[in-house]
Amino acid sequence: SSAAHHYGSPRVLCESFGGIYWNANFARMKWLTDWEYVLGIDLLNPHGFHYSIEGDRKRDWPPSQFYHHPFWKYYRRFAEYVSRLSYMLSGGKHVANVLFLFPIISAWANYIPQKRTTLFDIIERDFYYLTDMLLRIHWDYDYVDENILRDAEIIGDKIKIKEEFYDVLLLPPITTIKTSTMEKIKNFYNSGGKILAGILLPFQSAEKGYDEEVIKNFRDLFGVDPLEVSSEIIKCISMKRKRYAIKAIKRKNKRGGCAYFIKATAPLSAIKPSKLIDKLLSEMSKADVKIDDPEILCLHKVKDGVDIFFIVNPSEVTRNFTLSLRSRGKPEIWDPENGSVETLWIYQIENNGVKIPLTLHGYGSKFIVLKANEEEPHITDTNIKVERVEKDGDKIRIIAYAERACNAYIEISWKNLKEKLFLGMLEGPKIIELPTKWKFKIIGENAFLIDFWKVKMDDEEERGFKEGWYKPEYDESGWLSLNCGPLSAYFSEAPRALWYKSRFNVEGGKVRKILLDGVEGDAFRLFINGEEINVRGPSSILDVNITEVDISDKVRLGENVIAILIKPSSLKDGLLDPIRILGEFKVTEKECKISLDPLHNEIVVGKSWTEQGFPYYSGTIIYETEIEIPNLTSDKKVLLDCGDVRDILEVVVNDESCGIRLWQPYIIDVTRNLKSGRNKIELKVTNTAANIIKGEKVPSGLLSPPKLIMYDLHEISLGYNDFKGMTNHND
């Protein structure tokens, strides 16, 4: 994105999701997307959409984003989320205070292929540290290479590149610099510019190597000798000191220019002086954004005259924090998940800026948009949750609820007046635990994967037929044991023919078909219980090129035998993928023995599908239950909290859809859908493709018991005349 800013590119594209494998879900894809967009990407190119994943294609930088994945039916919602990000963040002007010199010349100057050098390690590790740390202390920046910096304009005490203006030039530890870069740095300082450097200063030029002029210029600029600080840091590192010393050496000129150098006895990556760097930057420039949580990331853009802040929580836990903005206006929260726009009612106006308390769930993201509207009544402080605020002339009506029992208060500001209202003790929510056993429906068919085989070479090709190797009564226990995969993993040369044989038990249910996938060779034949099966069949729902073969009339109760004869042409051939058996059954493991058993009509919430007979199922299971809710009144707010869901949740109450959650939090407002009396609840849960495609027993389903959380809504109404004046009121 820095290059796009400096070369004038209107869009920044990034190909994403290749290599995140078949257990990828929307939560992980959202995390990656948010990370990219908060760093300046505004056009997503998802990888990839395979027409077919049959055979080795499923291993070519997976996953497919296409119909093979159970989440495909919800993909439009994810695409709409990304579209909203792109719409909000495309175009406009990026706001950053810091210009960060990219230290590639110094890295090459100190790089030795045969070994790592001390100076190269400092340059590399401190570059990575500064890159991450600046994001965490919320000083946004652009990288700049020396050619771009050479051509940049100096306007007053700022550096201008295309449409970007920068207050501070940051020099990471460097040893080597172009002469033109050195001249630009001097001119910037002499024009009142601010420069922050650390640990190392240049003593070489790219043109000459060791360069006395470079040493003199940087010694005059920062008041320290570049050769001395280089020798000292190398000596300190070699002594392996456990205690570090660090200080800032500050130089200023009459035009307001600042040249600050951080001198230390260890690299920045070892000391991690984020507070010191934040303090020094704050002396040089006014922070555009301050957030009291280093885990929260922020991108600021100005578009159509409006300040837009993209706020991201890349951690998995809910975070409460305060967002302090130098800009001023009426804040709105724009939700890219559903496209809603709501006024933010809780904030403070301080020092001509805005302070906003916010909460973001794990992997959450929101836009804060500042609108230049007239002063509105707003809440400056409260310990209860504000549901909504309605304004009618000189009157406001606040609807709120207590998330826990408390002595409630709410402080309201309107123009130059403020009023703090004490509401007394409010009760917390009522929790309604839902049943642990639910009825269920499985969409499609359950799966059982056979990945363990007994294998024997048949160099005569016909010997296996003559001796009946494919028959149930033939004992294959002495054969070679192996898993699916190319023959190169087990053989030095391809045999003329190879028999695969495996056994499985059926105790009930209905076995309907098998899927033939990754059976590679010049020819192959399939046998079930000694009877050859016609391998021609229709395309399966899993993939257009994976054949579906009906075996419903070949399978019997008790032990069943499957045998496959493959004639490979090379070591790349063989049985590359598990054989997938589909039908209406559950997979049961008892005393290390696996059987296919009859389905029951109940499923337990709080336990994975993999523990309840569906270890290889990928798709959707519908949980169904009914609950009684007496005397449900209009002054209630009811949330359905499903806790830990893997991976997509769709909620239907009384036959009406209430919402879909592609990622956490799996909480949905069901207030309008519930009624007094009997209520029917359906939870449609969809997992990933890893279970059926890779045979991975990825936890799926409702992994914690759902519950209803019922809050009492309270109404606070007051007019402008109810306020009391306060002198010198900042807010």
Named regions from a protein language model:
Residues 558, 670-677:
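Glycine-centered tight-turn motifs at strand-turn-strand junctions
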Residues 1-473, 477-481, 487-513, 531-541, ...:
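Carbohydrate-binding surfaces of carbohydrate-active enzymes
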Residues 479, 496, 504-530, 562-564, ...:
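Aromatic-lined ligand-binding clefts that engage carbohydrates, nucleic acids, or primary amines
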Residues 548-554, 668-671, 694:
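Signal that preferentially marks extracellular ectodomain short beta-strand elements
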Residues 533-539, 656-663:
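Long, low-complexity serine/threonine/glycine- and acidic-rich segments characteristic of extracellular
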Residues 571-595, 693-731:
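Exposed low-complexity, polar/acidic, P/S/T/G-rich flexible segments that act as propeptides
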Residues 349-353, 542-548, 661-668:
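Short, solvent-exposed loop/turn segments in extracellular or other extracytoplasmic domains
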